[in-house]
């Protein structure tokens, strides 16, 4: 069983960030602003953001590596045994908000945690570091095409199959459907994808296998998303479509600020707020008790896509 190697993970994450940004810049024609930052309490990161691009209204591809003296509450709520441990948390997180409402918003994240006991005198196995990977990707369309959703899920499935076969893919797909769900609205955020967390925290998982799955998910992102926006970037739209896009973006904001573990962890651990909140869309609307017109394209999103299903 391979030993956890945070240096190898860190380098992979930096390479992943750079590779994705290079492709997205070629697609958009604009440049991502790069902002390297240091965290006074330990660690730092590289934020890469595009705003008012030719295609992307707002998007970010962020790397962070945070070092702390005690795990924050969001990370220990379901693992009280980790309270008081020092930690390293590193990851790449991206969110892209295209301007064209026929192009979906997308999110992808790959992260690695390692928590160590601060007291060297603690005997094993209690003193052994606890590590795990998390991540996934999910799609949030406004005017969805079944072809696009199927393309996305095919790429997700292909990323997981070498690391656990069909049962593991089903598990991560269903986990995604459960996780990206707005309980107060009783509706999913989008059409799902993959989600996993605590991979390796049981102490029985091989590090190389866990890292392999996490790496495969990150590497699959461009195959999952790029064909969709290449097909839809020139679809004509008007004020009605932009208005509905802004309304549905409100669900994105609600989920990220109320439920998302990564957002809560970042804020509670003293992460960089500007980088954490880059996931929020630039234009959002809320309406009181709005309902789509029956039979409309907007109603089709609710009736046919916003429910867990096999794609």
From Swiss-Prot:
It catalyses: coproporphyrinogen III + O2 + 2 H(+) = protoporphyrinogen IX + 2 CO2 + 2 H2O. Involved in the heme biosynthesis. Catalyzes the aerobic oxidative decarboxylation of propionate groups of rings A and B of coproporphyrinogen-III to yield the vinyl groups in protoporphyrinogen-IX. The gene is hemF. The keyword Oxidoreductase applies. Substrate binds at residues 93, 109-111, 270-272. It comes from Aromatoleum aromaticum (strain DSM 19018 / LMG 30748 / EbN1) (Azoarcus sp. (strain EbN1)). Belongs to the aerobic coproporphyrinogen-III oxidase family. This is Oxygen-dependent coproporphyrinogen-III oxidase. Residues 252-287 are annotated as: Important for dimerization. The keyword S-adenosyl-L-methionine does not apply. It is found in: Cytoplasm. The active site is at 107 (proton donor). Its EC number is 1.3.3.3. SUPFAM superfamilies: Coproporphyrinogen III oxidase (SSF102886). It is an enzyme of class 1 (oxidoreductase). Signal peptide: none annotated. Its cofactor is a divalent metal cation. GO terms for molecular function: coproporphyrinogen oxidase activity; metal ion binding; protein homodimerization activity. The record marks 184 as: Important for dimerization. Pathway: Porphyrin-containing compound metabolism; protoporphyrin-IX biosynthesis; protoporphyrinogen-IX from coproporphyrinogen-III (O2 route): step 1/1. NCBIfam families: PRK05330.1 (NF003727).
């Amino acid at each position: 069983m391979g030993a956890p190697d945070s240096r190898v993970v860190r380098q992979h994450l930096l390479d992943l960030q750079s590779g994705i940004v290079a492709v997205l810049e070629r697609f958009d024609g604009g440049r991502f602003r790069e902002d390297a930052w240091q965290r006074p309490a330990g660690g730092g990161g590289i934020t890469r953001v595009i705003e008012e691009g030719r295609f992307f209204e707002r998007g970010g591809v962020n790397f962070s590596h945070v070092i702390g003296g005690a795990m924050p509450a969001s990370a220990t709520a379901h693992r009280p045994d980790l309270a008081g441990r020092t930690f390293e948390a590193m990851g790449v997180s991206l969110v892209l908000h295209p301007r064209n409402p026929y192009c979906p918003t997308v999110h992808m994240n790959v992260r690695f945690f390692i928590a160590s006991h601060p007291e060297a005198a603690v005997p094993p196995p209690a003193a052994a570091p606890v590590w795990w990977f998390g991540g996934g990707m999910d799609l949030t369309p406004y005017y969805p095409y079944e072809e696009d959703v199927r393309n996305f899920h095919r790429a997700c499935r292909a990323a997981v199959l070498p690391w656990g076969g069909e049962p593991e893919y089903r598990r991560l797909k269903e986990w995604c459907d459960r996780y990206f769900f707005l309980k107060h609205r009783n509706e999913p955020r989008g059409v799902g994808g993959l989600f996993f967390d605590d991979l390796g925290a049981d102490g029985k998982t091989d590090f190389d296998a866990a890292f392999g799955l996490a790496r495969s998910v990150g590497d699959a992102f461009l195959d999952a998303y790029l064909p969709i926006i290449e097909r839809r970037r020139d679809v004509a739209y008007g004020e009605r479509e932009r208005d509905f896009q802004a309304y549905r973006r409100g669900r994105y904001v609600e989920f990220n600020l109320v439920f998302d573990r990564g957002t809560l962890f970042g804020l509670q651990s003293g992460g960089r707020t500007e980088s954490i909140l880059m996931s929020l869309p630039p234009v959002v609307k809320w309406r009181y008790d709005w309902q789509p017109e029956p039979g409309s394209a907007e109603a089709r999103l609710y009736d046919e896509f916003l429910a867990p299903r096999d794609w």
